[in-house]
């Protein structure tokens, strides 16, 4: 049986709706017609080609644009888009544990990706009670913040602790059987969340702060805390997250820059708790990823089946 890939972070609906990219196209065709300066890396076809069995697909709204009503409207529009894709047979939303194993069996034959839905940032929730309707439609994961602070917690770009409302939201997540994504969370709030929340935890898309000094990435101390919870870290092959000296417009970094983060994370978390979280087309494109990576299929050149898929599948099976 061929190994499969799991990508723990893809902004598919955001790309389709906000950037108006037709993700049903072959990737080469999308690159021909796409008007954006960043060359796209992802379409549904490129995921099938690479045997991406599971992708954590986001519901993402920029908290710097609009207000609560706008955010809520867009979250539900993105959710409806995923449901429409599922109705067309382009992908499958994985809502329950039984869906995961059934999907993996079918994926061997049809290579249709399965999506685990992730709300990236809780700013679109007016209260913890607004989480339940989203869970009923398939949401399984939540990150409390996207960069800036909100009513629930501080973010990586705006430090603040976990709030009382944030604690209530974490309790709501536990009751709904959801997982917590520590990405974009202020470190103080992340440690507080680990104390409050007893459910499954991970970081879908972050790198090693020891190699990339920035609050956006995980410190060694937070990696060790994640290890104690048997969580998984998804590493991001994005040059600006790999080398503090790299800036947009610079030549692409060698693949070794990404592998350094993998080695560091595996030393702290163990090789079974590090995986892939590309965040591809999340504000950058081909020009900003390491050399040798043109699309998902090229990640197989890393030759590590555990890192590319098995570690995330083990984590999902432990709670999903």
Residue ranges of model-derived segments:
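Loop-centered beta-sheet repeat module
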Residues: 159-195, 200-205
């Amino acid at each position: 049986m061929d190994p499969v890939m799991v990508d723990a972070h893809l902004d598919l609906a955001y790309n389709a709706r906000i950037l108006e990219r037709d993700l049903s196209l072959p990737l080469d065709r999308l690159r021909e017609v796409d008007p954006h300066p960043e060359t796209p890396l992802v379409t549904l076809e490129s995921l099938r080609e690479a045997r991406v069995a599971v992708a954590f697909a986001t519901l993402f709204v920029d908290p710097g644009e609009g207000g609560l009503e706008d955010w809520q409207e867009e979250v539900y529009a993105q959710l409806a888009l995923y449901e429409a894709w599922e109705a067309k047979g382009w992908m499958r939303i994985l809502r329950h544990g039984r869906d995961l194993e059934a999907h993996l069996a079918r994926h061997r034959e049809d290579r249709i990706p399965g999506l685990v839905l992730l709300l990236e940032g809780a700013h679109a929730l007016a209260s913890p009670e607004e989480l339940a309707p989203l869970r009923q439609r398939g949401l399984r994961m939540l990150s409390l913040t996207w960069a800036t602070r909100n009513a629930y917690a501080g973010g990586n770009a705006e430090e603040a602790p976990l709030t009382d409302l944030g604690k209530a939201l974490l309790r709501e997540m536990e009751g709904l059987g959801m997982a917590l994504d520590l990405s974009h969370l202020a470190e103080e709030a992340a440690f507080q969340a680990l104390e409050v929340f007893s459910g499954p935890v991970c970081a879908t898309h972050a790198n090693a702060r020891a190699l990339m000094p920035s609050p956006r990435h995980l410190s060694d101390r937070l990696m060790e805390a994640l290890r104690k919870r048997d969580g998984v870290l998804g590493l991001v092959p994005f040059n600006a997250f790999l080398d503090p000296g790299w800036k947009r417009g610079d030549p692409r970094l060698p693949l070794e820059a990404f592998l350094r983060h993998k080695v560091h994370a595996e030393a702290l978390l163990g090789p079974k708790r590090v995986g892939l979280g590309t965040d591809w087309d999340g504000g950058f494109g081909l020009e900003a990823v390491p050399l040798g990576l043109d699309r998902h299929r090229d990640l197989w050149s890393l030759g590590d089946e555990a890192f590319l898929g098995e570690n995330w599948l083990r984590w999902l099976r432990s709670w999903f």
